[in-house]
Amino acid sequence: MNRRRRYTGSNPSLRRVLYRAHLGVALVAVFTAGLAVTLVGLLTLRAYADPNQQLIARSISYTVEAAVVFGDAQAAEESLALIASSEEVSSAIVYDRQGQTLASWHRESTGPLHLLEQQLAHWLLSAPTEQPILHDGQKIGSVEVKGSGGSLLRFLLTGFAGMVLCLLLTALGAFYLSRRLVRGIVGPLDQLAKVAHTVRRERDFEKRVPEAGIAELSQLGEDFNALLDELESWQARLQDENASLAHQAHHDSLTSLPNRAFFEGRLSRALRDANEHREQLAVLFIDSDRFKEINDRLGHAAGDTVLVNIAMRIRGQLRESDLVARLGGDEFAVLLAPLASGADALRIADNIIASMQAPIRLSDGSTVSTSLTIGIALYPEHADTPAALLHDADMAMYIAKRQARGSRRLAELNDPRILQEEKEIDSATPEAPPK
């Protein structure tokens, strides 16, 4: 038969799975949104960078026009530096009519981010912008302006910092919302798991799952509680049936008295207790006189009524600690434990015999009388085992029945007369003695 796979603890819990899922979704969403915004921003900056670079080149061409006309390199450099230093320009060069460099300006490479700015400008900005310098409609030179990646780098760094901050805030928000959601989902599931574990380990079918705040989980809890109701009812019926079967296995169905197996087990325990506490006990072997005659003459129903009444009358003469059992047919056995003396056993036997003096009323209104013959064996005087005690009490009962029906007899240890009569009984025919 396939064994059910058990949880080993290596799998992640539902709580952790939900936390990871919520955090992952939130981070992916923020990262995707941040990346999209950054790309759109870069494209927008690039779209504005080209016209701005052309405006800067045109402004420089107007400013250095006079210096180019007169070939004044110093004035051209001063004008060039004045404009380029305040704009997003990495370099600017002024050429004369012959294409020779008249003036140039380059932004100083300060800081570790200069190379990164150059790389961004190379990747994202267009080629350097060239603007002719005109005088009276004639080209007298040109200006070459190369853009700087400083703005792009600042934008990227600001966007990255903002995205990291958003990711942190999103992670905190996702953790908080996940805890609330997990509390609503995992909490009821934990309760259900605890109840199921308690029911499985302790067989406590009275446990119930509390109502959840989510409809589906609440329905699951109701179905689980309904299942527990059925299991509790089934368990109760099973216990009742087991108790009934156990009672039937150890009790006589007619008289409801314990049977021979139950009596012998109880006698064995009583002997151990008596030996441990040095106490005395007695076994009474009881047989109904002329029961076969009553059963044959009046029928089995009358015989059953007689047996039930005998059981009730014997039980009525005993203490709560004593035990009476039906061994079979019309034979009964009584365990008297503890016992103060053998005289108490004789007195109880006399009371049982006396209880049978009143006639037994049958179902048809008629009455019938019977008597009981009792054999008594004492522990430890006569025997110290269950079988030996029952045997000695049985032998004493048969001897008493031969001598006088409706009497009682105490087994006697090593009594020659008892031994002789016991031999006669053992050698007699299998037919039971008259009752």
Swiss-Prot record:
Record note on what altering residue 51 to S does: No longer binds to YfiR
Active site per database record: 330
Outcome of swapping residue 68 to A: Residual binding to YfiR
Catalytic activity: 2 GTP = 3',3'-c-di-GMP + 2 diphosphate
Regulation acting on activity, per entry: Activity is tightly controlled by YfiR, a small periplasmic protein, and the OmpA/Pal-like outer-membrane lipoprotein YfiB. Diguanylate cyclase activity is inhibited by the specific interaction of YfiR with the TpbB periplasmic domain and is activated by YfiB, which releases the YfiR-mediated repression through sequestration of YfiR to the outer membrane.
Effect annotated for changing residue 171 to V: Residual binding to YfiR
BP GO terms, sorted: c-di-GMP signaling; signal transduction
Residue intervals annotated with topology Cytoplasmic: 1-22, 176-435
Residue numbers on the Periplasmic membrane side: 44-154
Membrane spanning stretches: 23-43, 155-175
GO molecular function: diguanylate cyclase activity; GTP binding; metal ion binding
Entry comment, domain topic: The presence of the HAMP domain is required for dimerization and catalysis.
PANTHER family: DIGUANYLATE CYCLASE DGCT-RELATED, GGDEF DOMAIN-CONTAINING PROTEIN
Annotated protein name in UniProt: Diguanylate cyclase TpbB
Species: Pseudomonas aeruginosa (strain ATCC 15692 / DSM 22644 / CIP 104116 / JCM 14847 / LMG 12228 / 1C / PRS 101 / PAO1)
